[in-house]
Structures are given as structure tokens and as C-alpha cells.
Amino acid sequence: MDEKKIIIDRAVLVGLNADCFTPEETSSEKTLDELEALLETAGGECVGKVLQNRHTPDPHSFIGEGKADEVRQMVQNGGANLVIFDNDLTPSQLRALEDLMKTPVLDRSALILDIFAQRARTREGKLQVELAQYQYYLPRLTVWNEEMGRLGGGIGTRGPGETQLETDRRYIRSRIQKLREELAEVRKVRAVQRQRRIKNSVPVVALVGYTNAGKSTLLNLLTGADIPANNRLFDTLDTTTRQLTLS
């Protein structure tokens, strides 16, 4: 019997703290720890972390050639096959970093989209994730095609599918438009359901909180639902509705 090979990504995590960054843009030990948790959620393993302090990002390679070479050495010494940045990168920065480090590079947004691709269960959720992935990868199409050849599967390659994202920009733009139309139809159905609840005077309560805060656990306790509630980030992606009767 043929045994299916399971790809375990080993990654070096990199963050940049620049003086010119806003609090939302900057990286820190805390955000790198969260990035490691995201990596574990995606099925990967962290083999090292690098946090760099600079006045401004390097316009070409974001962290500079010297630091990129340091990360490349960490990749080699740790047996890593992936570098993930805590900050968002431009297409040109992605290309420059891959050329310098000779390793596939992802940023935080790509990692989160990969997790979403694994977790989406409903039709609406899957449509939303596919649309987000196409919108993210469209300006990065050339870099992503090169990454696909290096990664060969695993983190950063899940979702719409390799063959679709290797096609031309015209197809992707057409697919984006199609997804938007399908989502509009799904939202019409949701709107009808909301109007029905309003008409029937059904009170609506929303549970809101950060990822892994315990929303699904609380909903299960209140309603007797059986929603998966694991201790990991973005475990429940889709919106869930349950009925609660108060006595």
C-alpha cells in the first residue's frame, strides 16, 4: 500500500521593528510568539526567530542583505524549508528576499489565508477565503509561481489550487468577479433570514472576541451545540447560529 507523504514545514520566523512603523505595523517578541502559534495551527514547526530593529525598512529587501544572509544561515542550520515574516511584504520585497535567502518566503497575511483555507467549512466561508486568496496573490503572481516550484505543497499552497493560480491574470480577474457574484447571492439569502428573525421579533445576540478567546466553548455551554472548540487560533472560521431558550 502506498503511504501518503505528510509535509511538515519547518520555518524561521522574522519580524522587523522600525522607528517609522505604526503600532499595527511593527513586530515584537509578543507578535512573533503569536506568529509561532499561527504556524503551529497551520501544521508547521518553528526552528528559530529573528527580531530586527531598524530606523526604516530596507527599500529593496526589507531587512537588508546582511540580516537576510543571517536568516539564510539559520535556515540551513535548522533544516528549515520556509521563512515567514511577521510583517506584510510587497511583491518586490518577496522576490528580493527569496533571491537572497534561496528559500520560499511568506508573510503573515499569506499564513493566515492558509489557515483559513484549511478551516472554512460553509459555502460562504470557502467563497470568502478563495476570493481573499486570489486578491492577495494576483499582484504576487510571478513570485507565487516560483514559490510553488520550491515548496511542492504545504503551508502557503493550499486553497484555490496550484493549477488555477498558475494561469494568467485574465483568468484570475474573471474568477474574482465570479466569486463576488456568488457571494452576493449568498448574502441575499442571509439578508432574508435576518429579516425573518426581525419580523418574528426574535432577539439576536452576538458573541464577539479575539481568536481562541473561547467563543465556541461559550456557545456550546449556552445552547448545547457541538461546535469544535480546540485550543488553537482560528479553529472556528465560519459564522455559526444556534437557538437559545431562556426560562
Predicted ranges, named:
Residues 1-108, 112-113:
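N-terminal accessory targeting/assembly segments
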Residues 3-11, 21-22, 144-247:
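Conserved G1/Walker A P-loop phosphate-binding module
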Residues 20-26, 57-61, 119-124, 163-164, ...:
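Flexible beta-alpha connector loops of hexameric P-loop NTPases
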Residues 35, 134, 172:
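A residue-level signal for conserved active-site and pocket-lining positions in enzyme catalytic cores
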Residues 110-132:
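Short alpha-helix plus adjacent loop in nuclease-associated cores
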Residues 131, 135-148:
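A charged, well-structured terminal subsegment
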